[in-house]
A protein has these predicted regions:
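Catalytic nucleophile serine of serine hydrolases
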Residues: 77
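Extended, subdomain-level signal for the structured scaffold at the beginning of enzyme domains
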Residues: 1-73, 81-93, 101-141
Length: 141
């Protein structure tokens, strides 16, 4: 799902791709999925500039919905910060990019390569994702 108004997307390096749908259309459908995966990249600075836009408001609603349904919440880099902004990290141990670590207030930011706490699976960055994947695969089976 694209966190945007359209499914026609471009990466920061200019690669064009099409998402299956937009985030707005995911609202109300958490019960149909096992997990929510948030791939961070450099989303946080962009999010900060556009937090009030409809697609980002929808993102926060979808994250909360998945958390309320007890779904797996998965992410890397500053995804833990997005989860924090969504208000779902109270007391949860989170692996987070070192630059985002000071912004984690309700969750417990760690320096670990990855953390698994309750239904949260977080990796510090894209280089630590491989160490998280075996545990995530077990949880998804």
């Amino acid at each position: 799902y694209a966190v945007a108004e359209t499914t026609d997307m471009r990466t920061n390096s200019g690669i064009r791709f099409y998402a299956d749908d937009v985030i707005e259309n995911l609202k109300g459908h958490a019960h149909e999925y096992d997990a929510l995966v948030f791939s961070c990249g450099d989303a946080v600075p962009v999010f900060k500039e556009h937090a009030s836009e409809a697609h980002n408001v929808a993102l926060m609603q979808v994250i909360k919905e998945f958390a309320e349904e007890g779904k797996l919440i998965i992410g890397h880099c500053a995804a833990a910060l997005i989860f924090e902004i969504a208000g779902i990290t109270e007391g949860v141990r989170l692996a987070v990019h070192p630059l985002a670590k000071p912004a984690i207030c309700k969750g417990i930011a760690t320096d670990s390569a990855y953390e698994i706490d309750r239904n949260f699976f977080t990796a510090q960055n894209e280089h630590t994702l491989p160490s998280l994947m075996p545990e995530l695969m077990k949880a998804l089976k």
